[in-house]
Amino acid sequence: TESPLAPAQRRQLRAIGHQLRPVVTVAGGGLSDGVRAELERALEDHELIKLRLAVGDREMRDALLAQLLQEHRAALVQRTGNVALLLRRNPQPDPRKSNLLRRLG
């Protein structure tokens, strides 16, 4: 999945993301309403999040990730194995919760 981020921007986001822990895990139950709601909340609050895809094989994870990116209007910053770093900017971020504002100042 290609994202509309400049290489320098992507590098900076990966550096921030390196310190983050996955906040949402998609497991055997797949994309339940609870997972979707939690992902939406996490993107709204934190803007930059890690997502763990603990399901199926690579093709299944690719399909799930593509679906999530489209549904939640998020950009893929990086994908390593079953962990993805997602970005969706919030027009009015909370400085106490946003991983971007807290790390970039």
Q: What role is predicted for each listed range?
A:
Residues 1-105:
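Positively charged, polar, low-complexity stretches
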